[in-house]
């Protein structure tokens, strides 16, 4: 597999140079030019490797290998916004220090290309799959899955498969995902402007406000940047499913104004201090997490968009009952049911075997708070690329994937595909 490493690394680096975060739609480009160009690049590479490819209206593409009952590998090429705090060009695709740097390196352009070149390795060694491997690459995973909805309208989604967009050894369960917008009225607001966050599923790393009366000493003591009459708090971005890995810039900004308004204290109590016990909900898949990722002051109220990941065995009503106890208006922006697969099923067992073959580790399947395309399948799981002990880089500044991990993914994915489609 080593002879494909150089090509894989180069392709990942090239792909990172496309800013494929969601942007304004253009003609025949539903998620913007960057996403469409990135999809074209991926499919062009696949075609050059000798595979049949399809581009479904720049929503989603697929690469075909083999004949028979379809088996899915579901990856995505879109990314979250770069955010702040980078020490390298987030869209440079720089290869240095044994790593490929840039937004999407780990989530999910790197793994997508590893799956593609794993298929190429199997093809070149003469392996003929007894099933049709469909490598499906979407362009709207981070913002609503319109790509998958479109695919299901124009093509046939396989029943089973895996998504290289989670973690190892195998992810058998994913928490439910609920995005809500909470509306907090603020009487006599002590600010004229308050805004923070870039994405609903990314911990806010920058928040700005314009106080009616600027307390310079207090602002400096809290570590805020002062720009004319505006104050700026800085945090650290992270994936909203693991908010503890980041530092939310919204919280200190709210605390700055807390002593001036009971309404501000209420916001803190609801979304940061867990006064109503949302985070007490838990099961075998873990506890509920709540990440307030976006905030805006509009028409006399603070609107806060929260990303909630709730335990996989609990009903949605367990969460909405707690939200109702807050006594504030809220609206549901997005909901995805949890995923639970059989730990002892063939899919999980074969993937664990492939993982063990290249790591030497006998491991058990895990549950996560992240949401992957595996939910689009009747029998789907997430399989890599993250491993226990990895530095958190997904949705963080200075995202990267190591060349060592790229090589490992090439081997594991090739082995897994052979086991599941022979």
Predicted regions span which residues?
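Acidic/His- and Gly-rich active-site-bordering loop/insert found
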Residues: 1-103, 124-129
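An extended, acidic, His-containing surface patch that forms the Zn2+-binding/catalytic region
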Residues: 43, 54, 243-299, 305, ...
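Active-site metal-coordination/substrate-binding segment of hydrolases
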Residues: 70-137, 143, 155-156, 396-397, ...
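Midchain, well-structured core segments that form catalytic/ion-binding scaffolds
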Residues: 142, 148-313
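Acidic-glycine-rich active-site phosphate/pyrophosphate-binding loop
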Residues: 80-96, 177-178, 183-184, 225-233, ...
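Conserved active-site and cofactor/substrate-binding residues in soluble primary-metabolism enzymes
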Residues: 3, 33, 37, 110-113, ...
